[in-house]
Amino acid sequence: MAAAESPTSVRKVVVHLRATGDAPILKQSKFKIAGTDKFAKVIDFLRRQLHRESLFVYVNSAFSPNPDELVIDLYNNFGFDGKLVVNYACSMAWG
């Protein structure tokens, strides 16, 4: 019998960060983040790592999510192969 997740346990989401265009490539591209965290935390992390204030961030090379979105919601709707793919660029890459 499988044990149910307790409400206090936090599900971790694997976020795969992929450089797009002229953006520098990170040494470590995969990270785990709590699903209850907002997407703004991913954006802030990238800004600190890249030392840039201006940054364009997309999910699955398709759209830029609202920073208030929960990471777990993005993963449940757009994640695949056990991870959420996040593309980042220093200039606008997709409309």
UniProtKB/Swiss-Prot annotation:
Source organism's superkingdom? Eukaryota
Subcellular location per the Swiss-Prot or TrEMBL entry: Cytoplasm
Q: Lineage from the top down? A: Eukaryota, Viridiplantae, Streptophyta, Embryophyta, Tracheophyta
Family of the protein in this entry: Belongs to the ATG12 family.
Its keywords, alphabetically, are: Autophagy, Cytoplasm, Isopeptide bond, Protein transport, Transport, Ubl conjugation pathway
Main subcellular location: cytoplasm
Give one Pfam family, short name only: APG12
Cross-link Glycyl lysine isopeptide (Gly-Lys) (interchain with K-? in ATG5) residue location(s): 95
The Gene Ontology CC terms held by the record are: cytoplasm
> Which Gene3D superfamilies would you find in this protein's record?
Phosphatidylinositol 3-kinase Catalytic Subunit, Chain A, domain 1 (3.10.20.90)
This chain belongs to the protein called Ubiquitin-like protein ATG12
Q: Which organism is it from?
A: Medicago truncatula (Barrel medic)
Q: Which GO terms describe its biological process?
A: autophagosome assembly; protein transport
> What does this protein do, in the record's words?
Ubiquitin-like protein involved in cytoplasm to vacuole transport (Cvt) and autophagy vesicles formation. Conjugation with ATG5 through a ubiquitin-like conjugating system is essential for its function. ATG12/ATG5 conjugate has an essential role in plant nutrient recycling.
